[in-house]
């Protein structure tokens, strides 16, 4: 579950990557885990962002000039979670566990770290 501090930190991260290229990287069904790659168009730096226990994904698989934002969300069965969207691109993802920034080898930047249960 992500708390208010988690949502705030994810949004700070997304603000730093505003304008990046967003690319579908992978989906792992065992944990309903979806990974996108954010890539800086001029420097070539990129980082993976993993969304765990997703129950809704909609939108493009590749878009430029991303502007992702994270919001609190409740699942139909009442679990607290997150909603990440880019309204201009028509991208939306909802999940009930965590957002992890810096997915293993999917990073070239030093800011890669998990954002999970920071407010617990």
Identify the role of each PLM range.
Residues 1-120:
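Surface-exposed, interaction-prone regions used to assemble/regulate multi-protein complexes
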């Amino acid at each position: 579950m992500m708390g208010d501090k988690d949502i705030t930190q994810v949004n700070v991260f997304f603000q730093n990557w505003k304008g990046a290229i967003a690319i579908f990287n992978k989906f792992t069904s065992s944990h309903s885990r979806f990974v996108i790659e954010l890539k800086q168009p001029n420097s070539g730096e990129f980082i993976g962002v993993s969304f765990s226990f997703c129950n809704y994904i909609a939108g493009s698989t590749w878009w430029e000039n991303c502007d992702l934002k994270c919001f609190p969300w409740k699942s139909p069965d009442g679990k607290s979670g997150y909603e990440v969207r880019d309204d201009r691109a028509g991208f939306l993802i909802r999940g009930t566990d965590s957002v992890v920034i810096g997915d293993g080898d999917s990073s070239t930047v030093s800011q890669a770290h998990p954002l999970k249960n920071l407010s617990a």
